[in-house]
A protein has these predicted regions:
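Classical Sec-dependent N-terminal signal peptides that target proteins to the secretory pathway
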Residues: 1-24
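Mid-chain, structured segments of secreted extracytoplasmic proteins
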Residues: 72-104
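Edge beta-strand at a domain terminus
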Residues: 111-131
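N-terminal helix-cap/turn-to-beta initiation motif at the start of protein domains
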Residues: 22-30, 124
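Short, surface-exposed loop motifs enriched in S/T, G, D/E and P with embedded aromatic residues
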Residues: 64-74, 80, 127
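Generic short beta-strand segments
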Residues: 32-38, 81, 106-111
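A short, structured loop/turn motif at beta-sheet edges
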Residues: 25, 100-101, 128-131
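Short, solvent-exposed loop/hinge segments that bridge or flank secondary-structure elements
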Residues: 28-62, 86-98
Length: 131
């Protein structure tokens, strides 16, 4: 009886370990950059970005510099926010939104200078999930 209880306990511990490994997996996306210009959307030449969504750390790492964004896991989208600075003097505020179904992404960049937005830009990304 005791040996059966020990075996069941080991199975329980192993199943918990493997289930946490399955849910802590990162989602890595390879994205083509679409620029927004005066005439509409244009594909950038040979520009790609990598988006790494770490569900366990609640962080999205974006771009070649792997800038960490705070992750909000919404029902239909992953939303990442990055803010550095003080809006009264100088600050950078970025918002990254990734659609869970289509993996379409958009990045809104705001630069605050003397309590006003001095630069406001948008970028769009067509992403493919990496295996």
């Amino acid at each position: 009886m005791r040996q059966a209880a020990v075996i069941l306990f080991k199975i329980l511990i192993l199943s918990i370990f493997f289930s946490t490994q399955a849910f802590s997996k990162n989602i890595i996306l390879d994205c083509d950059v679409t620029l927004v210009g005066i005439e509409g959307k244009d594909m950038a030449s040979d520009d790609t970005e990598v988006i790494d969504i770490n569900l366990k750390a609640k962080t999205i790492f974006f771009g070649a510099e792997a800038i960490p964004y705070n992750l909000r896991n919404r029902i239909n989208v992953y939303e990442g926010r990055y803010f550095k600075g003080n809006k009264r003097t100088f600050a950078i505020e970025n918002k990254l939104v990734i659609d869970k179904k289509t993996l379409q992404s958009s990045l809104n960049k705001n630069v605050w200078d003397n309590k006003a937005i001095s630069v406001n830009s948008y970028s769009y990304f067509d992403c493919i999930k990496r295996n």
